[in-house]
Swiss-Prot record:
It comes from Mus musculus. This is Activin receptor type-1. The active site is at D336 (proton acceptor). PROSITE patterns: GS (PS51256), PROTEIN_KINASE_ATP (PS00107), PROTEIN_KINASE_DOM (PS50011), PROTEIN_KINASE_ST (PS00108). Interacts with FKBP1A. Interacts with FCHO1. Interacts with CLU. Interacts with type II receptors AMHR2 and ACVR2A. Interacts with BMP7. Interacts with BMP9. Interacts with BMP6 (when glycosylated); the interaction may induce HAMP expression. Interacts with TSC22D1/TSC-22. Gene3D superfamilies: CD59, Phosphorylase Kinase, domain 1, Transferase(Phosphotransferase) domain 1. Coiled coil: none annotated.
Length: 509
């Protein structure tokens, strides 16, 4: 049994029916209703305001858990409310002020497959008996077919799936003909939006089959998984990094992170198997892998280089800015930006991942939320003020300037792999020539703070106008004085200008 906050995980109820033409119209300006709010997710509030109200019932460790609340984003309500009830969970939705006050969700009766069959037993006569016989025969045929289908699926599951609980109690959902990508893109562009309400259920984890481990680190593993035939990424956090899982889950469920250059969020889940707890973060899957791995194998032309760095700058600018309104977001600083935490998409753009150390700030309340995570960022990418411990920890702008320093180092990594005049450098991490492979805090402090060294700029860059502009830009990210560094928005505008000048040059030619 997991204690404290860990008993009620933040899980997503995800069932995606095939959208009709009418469903595909955006529902941004839906009317808001006052709803009764009951359950742990409500805190001290007894009501909330959203576009739909709900009442849910789920079974957690043998206990019936009732919750009431509201969906603040229409697409979330649409996805959840159309989920058919299962033996372990049910949700009923409505629209109207306080409409969920007298609604209590009911679990389906065991073994009730065809609700209308009881009516047939009340009828008499030859015709009715014939219909009942036909229905029973059809049910038997379907039952045999489903059993064979389930047995075939179980034979395909590997031992890892057994360990993570994807066989026992497997719940399937009818998602029509729509793919996961289409439904997620329709509901949340390519980011997550804010997460679904805290409905206590285990649907998501039990529907995912883990296929292969694609990455390991000191804080956990990343697996390629399959959900209803679609690839997803499953990050399984180790117990030592529980705070990072909780932080990412909190961010994705409270902040509108809908952006094509932020890793798209699907669900967060927790399972307890064999006396151990697995913490899952389920996101979009990008088969190209991290920017770190991509640069080691791939050289870049001018267009692909600019596409990568501009997309990273766009994602960082979106994190840093605060957006006001009902569809707004708090300002966020990443605090661990590096090439390993940036993923490459099929279209050549990138998206920023791993928000486990992120800091949030709201201007309206002037509240700085640094979380409660003992983990620190990557030493190689630490800014001078972090290394010499002069950073103003109570100032949000300080954390944004730390991100800008790290962005400059990532920009340097990418620029080295851009071919100009037939010349290109091998991939190397920042400060590869002055610190060991796993530098200590003191190693980096001496190089960056005492000696004030910066990554070397090759001479060949100055014969290429694009690389010359990028070199100037990265130097403005590396000022020893944090307040002198560029902002993410200024970097984005500068890179856009460089990209536009390249397009103009091609047109003139």
């Amino acid at each position: 049994m997991v204690d404290g906050v860990m008993i009620l995980p933040v899980l997503m109820m995800m069932a995606f029916p095939s959208p009709s033409v009418e469903d595909e119209k955006p529902k941004v300006n839906q009317k808001l209703y006052m709803c009764v709010c009951e359950g742990l997710s409500c805190g001290n509030e007894d009501h909330c305001e959203g576009q739909q109200c709900f009442s849910s019932l789920s079974i957690n460790d043998g206990f019936h858990v009732y919750q009431k609340g509201c969906f603040q984003v229409y697409e979330q309500g649409k996805m959840t409310c159309k989920t058919p009830p299962s033996p372990g969970q049910a949700v009923e939705c409505c629209q109207g002020d306080w409409c969920n006050r007298n609604i209590t969700a009911q679990l389906p009766t065991k073994g009730k497959s065809f609700p209308g069959t009881q009516n047939f037993h009340l009828e008499v006569g030859l015709i009715i008996l014939s219909v009942v016989f036909a229905v029973c025969l059809l049910a038997c045929i379907l039952g045999v077919a489903l059993r064979k289908f389930k047995r075939r699926n179980q034979e395909r599951l590997n031992p890892r799936d057994v360990e993570y609980g994807t066989i026992e109690g497997l719940i399937t959902t009818n998602v029509g003909d729509s793919t996961l990508a289409e439904l997620l893109d329709h509901s949340c562009t390519s980011g997550s939006g804010s997460g679904l309400p805290f409905l206590v259920q285990r649907t998501v984890a039990r529907q995912i089959t883990l296929l292969e481990c694609v990455g390991k680190g000191r804080y956990g593993e990343v697996w390629r998984g399959s959900w209803q035939g679609e690839n997803v990424a499953v990050k399984i956090f180790s117990s030592r990094d529980e705070k990072s899982w909780f932080r990412e889950t909190e961010l994705y469920n409270t902040v509108m992170l809908r952006h094509e250059n932020i890793l798209g969020f699907i669900a967060s889940d927790m399972t307890s198997r064999h006396s151990s707890t697995q913490l899952w973060l389920i996101t979009h899957y990008h088969e190209m892998g991290s920017l770190y791995d991509y640069l080691q194998l791939t050289t870049l032309d001018t267009v692909s280089c600019l596409r990568i760095v501009l997309s990273i700058a766009s994602g960082l600018a979106h994190l840093h800015i605060e957006i006001f309104g009902t569809q707004g977001k708090s300002a966020i600083a990443h605090r661990d930006l590096k090439s390993k935490n940036i993923l490459v998409k099929k279209n050549g753009q990138c998206c920023i991942a791993d928000l486990g150390l992120a800091v949030m700030h709201s201007q309206s309340t002037n509240q700085l939320d640094v979380g409660n995570n003992p983990r620190v960022g990557t030493k190689r990418y630490m800014a001078p003020e972090v290394l010499d411990e002069t950073i103003q920890v109570d100032c949000f702008d300080s954390y944004k300037r730390v991100d800008i320093w790290a962005f400059g180092l990532v920009l340097w990594e990418v620029a080295r792999r851009m071919v100009s005049n037939g010349i290109v450098e091998d991939y190397k991490p920042p400060f590869y020539d002055v610190v060991p492979n796993d530098p200590s805090f003191e190693d980096m402090r001496k190089v960056v703070c005492v000696d004030q060294q910066r990554p070397n700029i090759p001479n060949r860059w100055f014969s290429d106008p694009t690389l010359t502009s990028l070199a100037k830009l990265m130097k403005e990210c590396w000022y020893q004085n944090p307040s002198a560094r560029l902002t993410a928005l200024r970097i984005k505008k500068t890179l856009t200008k460089i990209d536009n000048s390249l397009d103009k040059l091609k047109t003139d030619c």
